[in-house]
Amino acid sequence: MNREERLARQSRIRNFSIIAHIDHGKSTLADRILEKTSALTQREMKDQMLDAMDLERERGITIKLNAVQLVYKANDGNEYIFHLIDTPGHVDFSYEVSRSLAACEGALLIVDAAQGIEAQTLANVYLALDNDLEILPVINKIDLPSAEPERVRQEVEDVIGLDASEAVLASAKNGIGIEEILEQIVEKVPAPSGDPEGPLKALIFDSLYDSYRGVVAYIRIVEGSVKPGQKIKMMATGKEFEVTEVGVFTPKPEKREELTVGDVGFLTASIKNVGDTRVGDTITSANNPADEPLPGYRRMNPMVYCGLYPVDTNDYNDLREALERLELNDASLQYEPETSQALGFGFRCGFLGLLHMEIIQERIEREFGIDLITTAPSVVYSVQLTNGEVQQIDNPSNMPDRQKIEEVEEPYVKATIMVPNDFVGAVMELCQGKRGIFIDMQYLDENRVQIIYEIPLSEIVYDFFDQLKSNTKGYASFDYELIGYKPSNLVKMDILLNGEVVDALSVIVHRDSAYERGKQIVEKLKELIPRQQFEVPVQASIGTKIIARSTIKAMRKNVLAKCYGGDISRKRKLLEKQKEGKKRMKAVGNVEVPQEAFMAVLRMDEPKK
């Protein structure tokens, strides 16, 4: 193609993504757009076409990004090339959203006509505004009996400040309003700007591992062009590769001779390691490199850690292989081997958030068939020692002695909760109970409120989301972002069995809630650990101070059964002998904690306040 042809093609490209809260109908709308532009034949079409993973279809959520090229014949007679980039809506994957938005010029904002604006919708809209995208509001699900499109239209104007007078009223399920949406994309979303002749700049917004071709990078070309045989360089790592093939997704991958400005597609270059194609990194040409990378790249740091151990210790190597494979596709997963006296060999893994953690666990159990035990999730604490050194602690058993600690800081998040008026009291009570600091409250309209709190991440990790949903009958929506570290009065609590510390059950807790939590755990263990021949104390301690205790009573053998009548001194001799034996047993006895007891303690919910 010469320069004129390239520019003419570039003016007909529209790159857009779809932003929505979970369950507002994003994947269904994507399906309708694919149908309307006849990207797929009727035979190939299935629901949630862009959600490839079984897990995504079951939970009805989008986890990995997908990008599709579509051709649409508009009413003005021209054929336009659309690139639809599907984004996840969940808060754990907000970095994925921000990268996919950076690859677009416009975004469809989908709002449910019955539910109105939710917390995650807002969070993603702000990301889109940060990336200077043209936002087109779409009010979806107008076929519902409870739909109130006019109220929602007003809400979009009041809460977000977008002009919603031209918002399309649509029902993705019934295919209403789809054509209007496509026409609006043609009219309102700007074509990509960028010099097709300039040095290559391409944004990596996702990558996956293919066992035949190595790493496949999903890219958006911002400037220049790329074709097979070209030498490319990653700007974050400085590594160089030779391109083997480029192409686009129509949802199926199709090879192309070159990708130019505005194209969204894939590139392979016999890259062996997903770590080399960091998401958000810029690809440039090795011979004619760009001066500076595209802005916005940052390394993702895990927020939540937990230990993963195979139930059957022989599965350790399989678990390592499973994690290696998942890491190929998921750059934000981190893991390192660790051992626990109680659970044997396993891995300490870092995740972006709780949903991310659950999904990884489920994928290991499903795709690799390994049964797992997971330890309680913990966050990264910053510990300042008396000698001035600062340590980052993600595992409670690595916490230094109390005498050496100057202060402990823990990560706080800013939580935005949207909730109907009736539940404001319940939500505020929950947040206060989780050591939340009240920041702000706004009434969005006569029946919905936005409440903002600062809450320690460790409290959210535990079971905040479940409690929020149950306290508000499922009506609250919730979004959080990390704001930094604050000092807290935190202590490490150990659980002792027969005087021995069980390392897998150590937790870091706030001093005020240590007694409650300790008492709960020892009571639970008392129920679940089988009785021994000798009595076993179960204790919770902070340092050397025991704060809670319960005792598993001994099983007793009746040694007097063989004395029919007879002298008291004879009986006493037998009882003394038994007592000696029990004492010796207790000194050398070892108490095994059964698997179920671990699972029960780690899954233990806090008492409802």
UniProtKB/Swiss-Prot annotation:
GO biological process entries: positive regulation of translation
InterPro entries: EF-4 (IPR006297), EFG_II (IPR041095), EFG_III/V (IPR035647), EFG_V-like (IPR000640), EFTu-like_2 (IPR004161), G_TR_CS (IPR031157), LepA_C_sf (IPR038363), LepA_CTD (IPR013842)
Topology of this chain in the membrane: Peripheral membrane protein
GO cellular component terms attached to this protein's record: plasma membrane
Keyword tags: Cell membrane, GTP-binding, Hydrolase, Membrane, Nucleotide-binding, Protein biosynthesis
Catalytic activity: GTP + H2O = GDP + phosphate + H(+)
Main location: membrane
Compartments, as annotated in UniProt: Cell membrane
SMART domains: EFG_C
Residues reported in the UniProt entry to bind GTP: D23, H24, G25, K26, S27, T28, N140, K141, I142, D143
Domain of life: Bacteria
Family matches, as Pfam families: EFG_C, EFG_III, GTP_EFTU, GTP_EFTU_D2, LepA_C
Domain called tr-type G: residue spans: 11-193
UniProt EC number: 3.6.5.n1
GO molecular function: GTP binding; GTPase activity; ribosome binding; translation elongation factor activity
Enzyme class: hydrolase
The protein's role, per its UniProt record: Required for accurate and efficient protein synthesis under certain stress conditions. May act as a fidelity factor of the translation reaction, by catalyzing a one-codon backward translocation of tRNAs on improperly translocated ribosomes. Back-translocation proceeds from a post-translocation (POST) complex to a pre-translocation (PRE) complex, thus giving elongation factor G a second chance to translocate the tRNAs correctly. Binds to ribosomes in a GTP-dependent manner.
Family under the similarity heading: Belongs to the TRAFAC class translation factor GTPase superfamily. Classic translation factor GTPase family. LepA subfamily.
Protein name (database record): Elongation factor 4
Gene name, Swiss-Prot/TrEMBL: lepA
